[in-house]
Amino acid sequence: MNHLFVGVDAEPVRMEPYVPSFFGWQGLLAGDVKLPANPLAPVLIAPNIGSYVGGDITAGTLAAGLWDKDEMSLFIDLGTNGELVFGNRDFMMSCACSAGPAFEGGDISCGMRATDGAIEACTLDKTTMEPTVRIVGDAGQKPVGICGSGIIDIISELFRCGIINAKGLFVREGERVKRDAHGMGRFVLAGEQESDTGREISINEVDIDNFIRAKGAIFSAIATLLSSVDMTPEMIDTVYVAGGIGSGINMKNAVNIGMFPDVELEKFHYIGNSSLAGAYAITMSDQAGQKLDEIAANMTYLELSTHPGYMDAFVAACFLPHTDSSLFPHSVQEM
């Protein structure tokens, strides 16, 4: 994004050895990039770390504060690219994985962003399979679609209730489970009369498969990043989760489907749009801007696309919760 913004060739970002044309940019003015502002106004660009870890992550790391802590922290920014930072005041490792747009409602038949009408939370009755949902918006708002946090809940609940198996296929029948002419299953959350659009709101096997791939990318990236410094999930003291996928993620459900490591739920903290918080900080404080440069200089980037073992870890993570159920003892107990 930074390359396109300042008009620099972005080709090196996607080609081996995946090194950006620049990491930081000083002295840029609004007039240089044709911003509708005072042409002499300074434009601050947060520094990149690697080809797929940009200024949004350095700004998010600043906001999360792991750079100033002794404890080991994991920072996760969920989006089309899942970006991670692990470390403390002594060191920081970063990487990025291609999660796709599922966390923001993309590649999901009834998916949408976390705006009015989005189903952002869901529970299912294990016996009747009846859903109870929470919808973004005013009281009485009918559902329009499902946002990222809602998708996490729905898939976790479908798996917990034995409605889908580890591959995300429907294995239990009921009034809410429908199948098309080809036998593909879907779970109906709201019928045509119950939705705000006059269309059925449901999640099907293709949607679930897309989301399993997205969560698999996140978990395998976490596992690879930790193993690169010879550490395990048990050594994580705090997990900061950022991203605009809803008003908050049900961390228990995210762990149950194998998206995050099975650590104590008290360690998780949802911090919303950390990139925006970091950008605000460097705009308002010269000291924060200096600290941002220090963060970038002290962060090591791990390129997952060329890292041995990452693809094997990804394939293993594309099940609910994982091919190795021993990694999720609490989730297995839940089921």
Predicted segments with their positions:
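Short glycine/threonine-rich loop-to-helix capping motif typified by GTGT followed
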Residues: 1-10, 183, 231, 243-262, ...
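Nucleotide/phosphate-binding catalytic cleft detector across ATP-hydrolyzing
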Residues: 1-74, 203, 207-210, 306-335
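Glycine-rich phosphate-binding loop of actin/hexokinase-like ATP-binding domains
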Residues: 3, 9-26, 47-48, 59-150, ...
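Glycine-rich phosphate-binding/hydrolytic loop that grips phosphoryl groups
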Residues: 33-36, 49-52, 56-63, 212-216, ...
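Phosphate/ATP-binding catalytic cores across multiple sugar-kinase/actin-like superfamilies
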Residues: 57-60, 212-234
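Non-transmembrane, aqueous-exposed alpha-helical and coiled segments at domain scale
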Residues: 70-73, 129-132, 222, 229-234, ...
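Catalytic phosphate/nucleotide-handling subdomain of diverse soluble enzymes
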Residues: 88-93, 97, 231-295
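Gly/charged contiguous loops adjacent to phosphate- or pyrophosphate-bearing nucleotide/cofactor binding elements
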Residues: 152-214
